[in-house]
Amino acid sequence: MTIERIFLARQPGGALLEFQHILVLAGAGIEGDRYFNAKGEAGQNITLVEAEVIEEFNATFGTRHELSCTRRNLVTRGVRLSLLVGKEFIVGNVRLRGVELCEPCMGLGKSMASEAVTPASVVKYLVHRAGIRADVLSSGTISTGAEFSIAA
């Protein structure tokens, strides 16, 4: 159970940038990310998606989407993220709490659509599989290759 890729965007709708390491701050999220220190709703600190879901989507629909296509911050491998909603877990040395499923929107559907798959089909396929939103409970660094564990 590891972090495979790390992305952030400096502004909403801005280009995604890939990093090997990111600094995350408790209650604020990823330093430099578009949602850093966003207030109002729980789960805005950081988002995660399973690499396997994107790979399965590509295999099912014959597409070639990159792992950044969902615009989630962390791309994981070997962990079923939906099982982490309501639980605390550790990535590297950072403690997180899964807040909610990050359900797909029509914007994501449109961005992943192709001649072979409609936006509505994208959304339908990704329901309950498009990742999770999490709160950052402790500050630290997350790096590609970082291991996951369930908090005790």
Please report, for each region that a protein language model flagged, where it lies by residue.
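Metal-cofactor-dependent catalytic cores
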Residues: M1-A152
